[in-house]
Swiss-Prot record:
UniProt cofactor(s): Zn(2+)
PROSITE patterns: UPF0054
Protein name: Endoribonuclease YbeY
Enzyme Commission number: 3.1.-.-
Compartment(s) of residence: Cytoplasm
NCBIfam families given in the database record: rRNA maturation RNase YbeY (TIGR00043)
Any one of the GO BP annotations: rRNA processing
Annotated organism of origin: Leuconostoc citreum (strain KM20)
Amino acid sequence: MDLAIIDQTHDGVSRYHHDLVESVLNFAGEALKLPVNTEMSVTFVNNDEIQRYNRDYRGVDKPTDVISFAIEEGEDDFNIISDDAWTEDIAKNIGDIIVSVDIIGAQAEYLGHSYERELGFLVVHGFLHLNGYDHMLGDAEEKEMFDLQREILDNYGLKR
């Protein structure tokens, strides 16, 4: 996977956590059988910045843990390159994930698992949204997404 990791925090995200995000997302991409040249980005921000995204794009004026911006989303969207014309030579950008580093530690502590498990959870959660999964559509969709999310994290080794 061609993954851009952007750190917009003041304190900086450790090299270890950059590598973890890259590794877990490559693992998730393999689980979904995505082409190796799939492109996406993960941007680390603070609470103020993610609140701005949440307010401007979702109409919710408070911080959140992760926001996903899929390139192709919903029934009204169309493929820029048709599925028939798609080749391994053409990279497909699936979108962007924004993660609040301020929330990762607090949620990990509250839920009783490691910072790494929470970080993995959030990026896999966002990644699944970029790939068309949506837990907000109903009980069946929620179960499908959360089961796949848990399976990916467990198989990777980030268990609760």
